Amino acid sequence: MLTVIAGPCQHESLEQSFAIAKHCQEVCHRYNINYYFKASFDKANRSSIDGKRGVGIDNTLIDFIDIKEKLGVKILTDVHTEGQISRCRDVVDVLQIPAFLSRQTDLIQTACKTDCIVNIKKGQFLAAWDVAGILSKCENAEEVWITERGTSFGYNNLVVDFNGLQYMLNNYDVPIVFDATHSCQQPGGLGNSSGGNRDYVPGLTR
């Protein structure tokens, strides 16, 4: 069954996240698609100190509980520290390791000791075959996913290496996720924030 991970990226309010989760759930149900709602309580790697980071872990987890109780959706959120893992593990279904932290051994191993699925976003600086080293840190995990989110291509640009995507599908016995929207990102491309071109997303996801 096809799985879709979708949401507002950054959790801003209960009303907004609930509306997005409800709409995505309805569409995915219509087409028999497995759905995970995704939102972040803290965007800790913004390009600038002025970048909006979110409403924080306390308010977000309260809202996540409300959304799960009312809609029954599965929830994915990213974590940046071991302390955040202990806070989130009983609320969300998937703990996501951000791409910039995809080689952080302690963070990965702590996430893998929970009952959550662990989704590790492959760093923009890693080759497909480097993922073997990441997976070697995940022996105790309930389930692990690897997400392709683009590869650095010079300054402020990413490309998608579909050869690498196929390599991971062929060589790793874990689900491989494709993050089409972040693969079209232009990191720091707007100076104090990242840019991107959403027009490329439909072509990449075909």
Listing of model-derived features with the role each one plays in the protein:
Residues 23-31, 52-76, 110-117, 165-176:
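Alpha-helix-loop-beta-strand connector modules within alpha/beta enzyme cores
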